[in-house]
């Protein structure tokens, strides 16, 4: 994946459309296509990758944060439908914070929080999946950030995210 950094009014629309195609359209289509077969067999687990960003407002990265929120809400919604139909199929969401990947270079951002290794995130995620968890957030600091975001007013979270992102300009 990749992000588009900058004021929404100034960011490149073509890059944002590619971001939406990657983070929203592809996830939606692939989930729908794979889910049908899994439901027929009553077996399977789809893991969609969201982000801690999907739980926060995202000034200066509006398209990215919004796309990750879509992934989280889509997955949660489908999973609830599956549970209500007594299906054994699950749709999970991985909600990581910074992970050491090429994303930072492509998005041209630096993270204030310590990045987790991709190996740690993968092992943690598989462990939680095998235990039937569907809302997976690796890292204590990211879990804490997610909790604070949940109990904070949106306008306060927006201001904090803006100040944090602004330092990257």
Model-assigned labels for residue ranges:
Residues 56, 77-89:
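Active-site-adjacent segment of SDR/Rossmann-fold oxidoreductases
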Residues 5-8, 15-18:
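Substrate-binding pocket helix/loop in short-chain dehydrogenase/reductase
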């Amino acid at each position: 994946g990749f992000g588009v950094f900058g004021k929404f009014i100034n960011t490149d629309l073509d890059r944002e459309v590619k971001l939406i195609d990657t983070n929203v359209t592809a996830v939606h289509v692939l989930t729908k296509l794979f889910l049908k077969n899994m439901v027929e067999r009553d077996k399977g687990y789809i893991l969609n990758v969201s982000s801690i960003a999907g739980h926060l407002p995202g000034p200066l990265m509006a398209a990215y944060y919004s796309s990750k929120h879509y992934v989280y809400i889509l997955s949660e919604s489908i999973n609830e439908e599956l549970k209500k139909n007594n299906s054994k199929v699950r749709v999970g969401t991985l909600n990581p914070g910074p992970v050491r990947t090429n994303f930072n270079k492509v998005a041209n951002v630096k993270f204030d929080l310590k990045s987790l290794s991709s190996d740690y995130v993968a092992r943690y995620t598989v462990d939680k999946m095998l235990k039937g968890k569907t809302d997976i957030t690796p890292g204590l600091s990211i879990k804490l950030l997610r909790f604070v975001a949940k109990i904070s007013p949106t306008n306060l979270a927006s201001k904090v995210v803006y100040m944090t992102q602004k330092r990257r300009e």
